[in-house]
């Protein structure tokens, strides 16, 4: 019977077999595009065979299956359908299929408490079906989930498995497993509001069985468990095999030292692992008492671990830490989300609007309280309580996503790591050949069979360097430490090397390229059909709709008598002089409730048609990046009806206004300000035919408020470039790294900023792409519009920086709507656009993520730098995401910089290049060290001797370990260059270097051997006595002395500095180690002294021969450095001359070459259909 393997695609949410690893914060960040499940169940005969094999082979199969669980599963169990599976094998592949992960999990069963999953009567469908599971979604999607609960209740058993903290339940109707977070997929905002009456105890118990407890559990293993895991690691397994072999070969001191070092290493690893687990557990541990609603108006205090999706929380006014993800359904909250997004500014959360739209935590993040965030203040307006409905719990929450990303980082597909595994495999083959050679030689020398076996196996421990993984890890640890000292924190050290391969970096604009704060330049009022000149001080405006809109159209709140909120809103309100207060305004009806009150300044202008009075905000629709606008509904004492004000992007607000209220020169005036780099916000308003009360205003929908508005004017704000921006951009461009701006701001403003900072040079062409959707029988069309090359920023000519024109016909700029049209209607043109586009404006957060993914499909190594607010998805999807934040770690990116500028980007790239180049050097050195010792042992095996016990100890621990650790300390080069470190280990330069250096090493050792046996005073060793009993002898002394120098020479030769690292002389500890060890080796040759006896060296009395040995060392030193120098300087040119230039394997390079030969678009251009 064949295994039932279900291929589940991650791009189809309705499919319940989908394994989606995204969280509510970042649903698009999953690297998995396909997941395959294979089911297995028990087989008595297979189990008997398995246990028999384990017992007969002394547990070796058990150890092997521990390292390769899939082999054990296939041997013990038989394939079966997923419906009957007891064990699952899960295969996860990324989008490009370059990385593959295998997991083995057990299917668990749990009894379901008999109970109803139906919502209160007002939430039930007409036929009485429950909507609690997923809400009402199109077609019959919710029916499958409802059927799940009915089936499971009938059988009173639930089948599920847990992978990386996420729970997946069996869907009988779909015959697949479904992630529990998808059970609520399709729930509408109306469904969420219907849950505000709470769950019954039976419903809560049943849901807890399905969803699991609301805890983010960090497994903390005991020291005994950790010891078993560490000791049974393949690395330590190889060490144990080697130690046993050395003991059998009478290498007691060496075996004892390696054992002690391994034991200390294990103990340190156990302590560090357990300490990290305990620290992380203490950080994420959250257990608080919360108040929940029950049907019938009852309230109950429960532990936060008991919460399930559908519970309704009563939030205290003093706030606290959120124990789950929840949708706010009544009241408002001021929240600090810095622990997740890195955004230090408190955020105002308002009640989720009712309606048939599907609820999505990302889309409705302004109405969602995320787990782990701190509620600073909660206020109720309609009703006595602030209510929030639980939407996600445990690892499905935002905090759970952060913890999961730390515990289970996304696998990295890196050519260097793949090649290193292949190289180790090649060394293993070489060890096998050496083993065969040694067996033949030792047999000819009539060595006993026991000795032949031990010596042959000993070669394996020589050729395959067991310390290689540790040496490679040291490289990234040094880089991580250097980054930390510069205020850059990294939670995924393996991504440091990826920083060295960056080809393109995307930047957010506001707060990243430009200053975070905005200065109000003035207001452009609208009078009739004419936009008046700029009024520099809005506080001098006459009292009217425009001034009231400026004073009230914001999401500010008061915390401890201090206004908090978006910096732009704070500046706008500050420019009016109005003061924020909370509570009813003076003169309001008794008992009336309002959100906030804006009070006019006491000493305002006297020339007013009516005296200034406080204005109360009745309703707010917060700003949405997707909608690009926010709305408020206000009233004031004496007003007969409230007014609505809208603030947002000029183009969008104008489209919401009645055409007769938008002046004919609106576009020209707007362009005059945006072309100068100013940020422009439009304001509009209208009276509302409702009662001026909070209750009436809260019933309004956003569509009602935003219909048939009247334009009021424009708010012009100045957003200066940060002083570090232009130099950093020029540095990146000079080194061949593309820079791209991805912003939600106006296209013209973004283009101006791009020219001002040097992304687009003064002499470079730029064209704007404008796309139109297909309509009225006309197909979608693209239009390319050339722009002027003047770079004026905020009214002043930008500082000029020399730019290096990029190899492309022209720069392109486009908006988010155009990007959407390109993806949908012009997929073949999209790659051509992406390799030339420099400015992406009016991009929604999800479009930023899509852009990063599209660039990665062109095989760019993509970096993303942003402030972590609207860039969460893009920062996490990028190969190297850098969040500008004061927090040490955030959910949004592997790198977090406390620097408030993009200077961190070149720093990460320099450290990445240094780390990658160092990794190559360390790998080469460890390989050369193994091969050098391999050659020494083979030479000595040939004459029936070997290196001594303490000689191995001196080479492996004193010499090699010291230089391997210290050579990684060299810091990065101070400047970036156009060259990039190699990414492929199996390349001609690397392999050529290894082969030539090994040939030189072998030649020197053989030369020394033949020189010593040619001396008249030479006495050959007694070949009838096996090693190490035939020590000391001349042959061993010469080979050991020469090889000792070779380890130092090779370490220095492969530790070149430029262009990615600082010069060798800057690494003082490394130079001191080389000098000291070299001096000791020189002393061993010239004046052996006290070390001669313990090391088993024979005294050479011929002074001229000693100098001859040092001459060989000097020749080896010069030859090694000459080889590296010639290979670096001449080999690339020779390879280009010998072999014809081939097309690049990277798609973006092929496109650039094509565009260089056939420029596109050709300016001036028209439309493309």
UniProtKB/Swiss-Prot annotation:
Q: Which residues lie within the membrane without crossing it?
A: 45-65
Q: Which domain of life is it from?
A: Eukaryota
A GO biological process of this protein is: intracellular calcium ion homeostasis
Q: Which residues lie on this side of the membrane: Lumenal?
A: 247-250, 444-458, 941-946, 1015-1037, 1091-1106
Glycan attachment residues as annotated in the record: 1022
- How does this chain sit within the bilayer? Multi-pass membrane protein
Q: Name one Pfam family in it.
A: E1-E2_ATPase
Location of the protein in the cell:
Lysosome membrane; Late endosome membrane; Endosome, Multivesicular body membrane; Cytoplasmic vesicle, Autophagosome membrane
Reaction catalysed?
A: spermidine(out) + ATP + H2O = spermidine(in) + ADP + phosphate + H(+); spermine(out) + ATP + H2O = spermine(in) + ADP + phosphate + H(+)
EC number(s): the record gives: 7.6.2.-
GO cellular component assignments: autophagosome membrane; late endosome membrane; lysosomal membrane; lysosome; multivesicular body membrane; neuron projection; neuronal cell body; transport vesicle
Q: Which family does it belong to?
A: Belongs to the cation transport ATPase (P-type) (TC 3.A.3) family. Type V subfamily.
| Notes concerning its domains | The N-terminal region is required for targeting to late endosomes/lysosomes. It does not traverse the membrane but contains a membrane-embedded intramembrane domain and interacts with the lipids phosphatidic acid (PA) and phosphatidylinositol 3,5-bisphosphate (PI(3,5)P2). PA and PI(3,5)P2 are required for the protective effect against mitochondrial stress.
- Description of how the protein assembles with itself and partners: Interacts with MYCBP2; the interaction inhibits the ubiquitination of TSC2 by MYCBP2. Interacts with HDAC6; the interaction results in recruitment of HDAC6 to lysosomes to promote CTTN deacetylation.
Q: What is this protein called?
A: Polyamine-transporting ATPase 13A2
Q: Which organism is it from?
A: Mus musculus (Mouse)
What lineage, starting at the top, does this entry show?
A: Eukaryota, Metazoa, Chordata, Craniata, Vertebrata
């Amino acid at each position: 019977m064949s295994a039932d393997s279900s291929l589940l695609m991650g791009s189809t949410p309705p499919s319940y077999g989908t394994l989606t690893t995204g969280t509510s914060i970042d649903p698009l960040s999953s690297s998995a595009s396909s997941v395959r499940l294979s089911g297995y169940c028990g087989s008595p005969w297979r189990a008997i065979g398995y246990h028999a094999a384990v017992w007969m082979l002394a547990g070796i199969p058990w150890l092997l299956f521990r390292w390769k669980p899939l082999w054990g599963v296939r041997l013990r169990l038989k394939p079966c359908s997923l419906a009957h599976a007891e064990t699952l094998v899960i295969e996860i592949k990324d989008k490009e299929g370059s990385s593959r992960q295998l997991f083995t999990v057990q299917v668990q069963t749990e009894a379901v408490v008999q109970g109803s999953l139906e919502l209160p009567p007002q939430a039930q469908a007409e036929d009485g079906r429950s909507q609690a599971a997923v809400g009402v979604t199109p077609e019959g999607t919710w029916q499958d989930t409802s059927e799940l609960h009915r089936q499971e209740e009938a059988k009173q058993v639930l089948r599920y498995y847990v992978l990386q903290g996420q729970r997946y339940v069996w869907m009988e109707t779909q015959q697949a497993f479904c992630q529990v977070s998808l059970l609520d997929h399709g729930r509408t905002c109306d469904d969420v509001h219907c849950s505000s009456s709470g769950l019954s105890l039976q419903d809560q118990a049943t849901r807890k069985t399905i969803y699991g407890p609301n805890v983010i559990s960090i497994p903390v293993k005991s020291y005994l468990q950790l010891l078993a895991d560490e000791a049974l690691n393949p690395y330590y397994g190889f060490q144990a095999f080697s130690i046993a072999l050395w003991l059998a070969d009478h290498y007691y001191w060496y075996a004892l030292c390696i054992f002690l070092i391994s034991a200390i290493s294990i103990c340190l690893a156990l302590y560090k692992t357990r300490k990290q687990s305990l620290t992380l557990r203490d950080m994420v541990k959250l257990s608080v008492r919360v108040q929940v609603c029950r049907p019938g108006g009852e309230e109950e205090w429960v532990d936060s671990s008991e919460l399930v999706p559908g519970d309704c929380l009563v939030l205290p006014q003093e706030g606290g830490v959120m124990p789950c993800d929840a949708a706010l359904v009544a009241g408002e909250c001021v929240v600090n989300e810095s622990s997740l997004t890195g955004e230090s500014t408190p955020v105002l959360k308002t009640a989720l609007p009712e309606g048939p739209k599907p609820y999505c935590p990302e889309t409705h993040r302004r109405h969602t309280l995320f787990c782990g965030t701190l509620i600073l203040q909660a206020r109720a307006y309609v009703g006595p309580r602030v209510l929030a409905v639980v939407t996600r719990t445990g690892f499905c929450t935002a905090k759970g996503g952060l913890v999961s990303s730390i515990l289970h980082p996304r696998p990295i597909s890196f050519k260097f790591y793949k090649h290193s595994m292949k190289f180790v495999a090649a060394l293993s083959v070489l060890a096998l050949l050496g083993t065969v050679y040694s067996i033949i030689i030792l047999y000819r020398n009539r060595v006993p069979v026991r000795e032949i076996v031990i010596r042959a196996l000993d070669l394996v421990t020589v050729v395959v360097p067991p310390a290689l993984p540790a040496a490679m890890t040291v490289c990234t640890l040094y880089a991580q430490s250097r980054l930390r000292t510069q205020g850059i924190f990294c939670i995924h050290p393996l991504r440091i090397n990826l920083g060295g391969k960056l080809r393109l970096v995307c930047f957010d604009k506001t707060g990243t390229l430009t200053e975070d704060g905005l200065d109000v330049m003035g207001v452009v009022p609208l009078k009739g059909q004419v936009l008046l000149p700029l009024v520099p001080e809005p506080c001098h405006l006459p009292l009217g709709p425009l001034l009231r809109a400026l004073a009230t159209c914001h999401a500010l709140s008061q915390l401890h008598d201090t206004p908090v909120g978006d910096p732009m809103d704070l500046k706008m309100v500050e420019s009016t002089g109005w003061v924020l207060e909370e509570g009813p305004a003076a003169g309001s009806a008794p008992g009336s409730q309002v959100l906030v009150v804006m009070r006019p300044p006491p000493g305002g202008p006297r020339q007013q048609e009516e005296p200034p009075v406080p204005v109360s905000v009745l309703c707010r629709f917060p700003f949405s990046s997707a909608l690009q606008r926010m709305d408020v509904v206000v009233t004031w004492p004496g007003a007969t009806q409230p007014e609505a004000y809208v603030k947002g992007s000029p183009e969008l607000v104008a489209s919401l206004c009645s055409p007769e209220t938008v002046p004919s020169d609106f576009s020209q005036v707007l362009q005059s300000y945006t072309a100068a780099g100013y940020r422009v916000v439009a304001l509009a308003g209208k009276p509302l035919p409702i009662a001026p009360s909070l209750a009436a205003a809260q019933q309004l929908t956003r569509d009602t408020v935003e219909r048939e508005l009247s334009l009021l004017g424009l708010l012009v704000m100045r957003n200066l470039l940060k002083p570090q921006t232009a130099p950093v951009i020029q540095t990146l461009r000079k080194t061949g790294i593309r820079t791209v701006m991805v912003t939600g701001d106006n296209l013209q403003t973004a283009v101006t900023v791009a020219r001002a900072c040097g992304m687009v040079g003064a002499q470079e062409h730029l064209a704007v792409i404008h796309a139109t959707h297909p309509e009225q029988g006309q197909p979608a069309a693209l239009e390319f519009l050339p722009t002027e090359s003047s770079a004026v920023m905020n009214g002043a000519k930008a500082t000029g920086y020399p730019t290096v024109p990029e190899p492309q016909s022209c720069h392109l700029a486009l908006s988010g709507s155009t990007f959407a049209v390109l993806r949908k209607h012009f997929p073949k043109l999209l790659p051509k656009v992406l390799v030339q586009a420099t400015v992406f404006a009016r991009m929604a957060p999800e479009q930023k993520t899509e852009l990063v993914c599209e660039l990665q499909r062109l095989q760019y190594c993509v970096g993303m730098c942003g402030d972590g607010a609207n860039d969460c998805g893009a920062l996490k999807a990028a190969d190297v995401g850098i969040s500008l934040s004061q927090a040490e770690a955030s959910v949004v990116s592997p790198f977090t910089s406390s620097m408030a500028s993009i200077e961190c980007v070149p720093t990460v790239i320099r450290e990445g290049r240094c780390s990658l180049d160092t990794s190559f050097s360390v790998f080469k050195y460890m390989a050369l060290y193994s091969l050098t010792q391999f050659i020494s042992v083979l030479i000595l095996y040939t004459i029936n001797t070997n290196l001594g016990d303490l000689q191995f100890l001196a080479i492996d621990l004193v010499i090699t370990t010291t230089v391997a650790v210290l050579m990684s300390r060299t810091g990065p080069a101070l400047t970036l260059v156009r060259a990039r470190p190699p990414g492929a280990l199996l390349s001609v330069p690397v392999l050529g270097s290894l082969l030539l250096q090994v040939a030189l090493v072998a030649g020197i050792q053989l030369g020394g051997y033949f020189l010593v046996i040619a001396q008249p005073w030479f006495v050959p060793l007694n070949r009838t006595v096996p090693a190490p009993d035939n020590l000391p002898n001349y042959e061993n002394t010469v080979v050991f002395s020469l090889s000792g120098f070779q380890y130092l020479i090779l370490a220095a030769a492969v530790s070149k500095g430029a262009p990615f690292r600082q010069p060798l002389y800057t690494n003082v500890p490394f130079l001191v180690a080389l000098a000291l060890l070299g001096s000791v080796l020189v002393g061993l040759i010239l004046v052996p002294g006290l070390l001669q006896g313990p090391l088993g060296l024979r005294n050479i009395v011929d002074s001229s021969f000693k100098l001859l040995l040092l001459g060989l060392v000097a020749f080896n030193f010069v030859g090694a450095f000459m080889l590296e120098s010639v290979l670096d300087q001449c080999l690339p040119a020779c390879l280009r001359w010998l072999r014809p230039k081939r097309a690049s394997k990277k798609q973006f390079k092929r496109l650039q070459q094509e565009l260089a030969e056939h420029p596109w678009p050709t300016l001036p251009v028209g439309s493309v259909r």
